Amino acid sequence: TGLYEAMLEAKDKGMIRHIGITNHRLNVAHEAIESGLYETLQFPFCYLATDKDLELVQDCKKAGMGFIAMKALSGGLINNSAAAYAYLAQFDNVLPIWGVQRESELDEFLSYIDNPPALTPALQAVIDHDREELQGEFCRGCGYCMPCPAGIEINNCARMSLMIRRAPSAAQLTDEMQAKMRKIEECLHCGRCK
């Protein structure tokens, strides 16, 4: 396509230092590792990771490839930043991207630089509870499935029951949000959101 060649040229000119790839599919991620073309892989990774996700992290390490953990808080479903930080700190080849939405959250993560949370039994209990409640196939809110041909806000609607349980529910129960949820009745069953 010429895109990779353009990145190589930019690297040769000193315009960029590294070439990485981002995706959400395990098979594509493994192909990227095996290709040897990329220096980093950006992939969803958090303490809700499956064994296959953990294997991907190890495969990157074996290949000398950096691993950038996106969705480290699972699009807001993980609400204990100390547990998330302590879990990811176990992996010396993983650099998380924290989805900071408020200044207070930024302050929280900045405080971990000087005082990093350790994976204590109490934090492990938080992780175990969240895994029991959340692990498996669920929407992380990335929005890659958008736009929906029926006008459904897939990334919000698919996560609604989880968000009501895990976040302040008032924002999810507005008339506007209820109207957006009713759009589900117009679903075309095209499978784009799978």
Summary of predicted features, one role per range:
Residues E55-K194:
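Structured C-terminal cap/extension of enzyme domains
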